[in-house]
Every structure is written in structure tokens, then in C-alpha cells.
Amino acid sequence: MAFLPLDPGRQVRESNPMTALEHFEKLLEFETDCWDVHEDLKSGKPDYVILDVRSLEAYAVGHVPGAINLPHGRIVERNLAAFPAGAAFVVYCSGPHCNGADKAAVRLARLNRKVKKMLGGIAGWKWEGFELE
């Protein structure tokens, strides 16, 4: 089956494969997903801290097992003192409709902390059928 090039007048345009490779490799450097976090939890203690950056009330209703609640607005150096300087963090919020995880990631990066965002947030976690704590 032969494919014709995309019409340049259309909204969806073809991308340069090398540019696409660079783009998606960069995304994977900063993002993970619910499945990968779940697999890490199943295999033993992950080598990162899972931060639920939602409100305490939302956290209390249910959260990823082992996650620590630290709302994104409270991510400051003194609240990270309990974690080693080299600790890596995976942050999540309510879901794709929420930018709390992005805000948390910015704050952590500004504090020179390693961070990834868990795509899907708690909504994605529940959609996958994973247990809450």
C-alpha cells in the first residue's frame, strides 16, 4: 500500500523524522505514565519519590500507593528537607485537565531537583484499574 504525502494545505502535516525523534525522546525524559509507575511499585520500592500534588482533601479520598502529599503551592526548599538532595520525584495531580503536576515540576526543577510528571494523574491511575491507598 502506497501512501501519498500529506496535502500542505491541511491542518495535519507530516513531520521530519529526526525532529520527531528528538521531540519524543525529550518528552520521555520528563514524562512517565501510570503503567510504568505501577510496574515499578509492583517490582519493589521505586528509586524515586511519588508526590501527589493535589489538595490534602483530594489525597485523603485516595492516592497512588506510597505517594506523599505535597500540594504544588507548598513545594519550597524547607518542605523538601526530608528528602536527599539527589532524590528524584514523580509528580501527579488530578488528571489531564489539571496543570498542578506541571506547576510542581517547575517548582522542583527551580530547586534543582530531578523530576518527571506522571501522565494521566489520578484519573489515569483509576482508569487503568490500579488500586488506591
Regions found by a protein language model. Name each.
Residues 70-71:
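Short acidic-hydrophobic, aromatic-tinged amphipathic segments that line or gate anion-handling sites
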Residues 59-65, 125:
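Short loop/helix-cap segments at secondary-structure boundaries that form the rim of catalytic
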Residues 17, 34, 53, 67, ...:
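Small-side-chain structural scaffolding
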Residues 44-50, 65-66, 88, 114:
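Short active-site oxyanion
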Residues 74-79:
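Alpha-helical scaffolding within the catalytic cores
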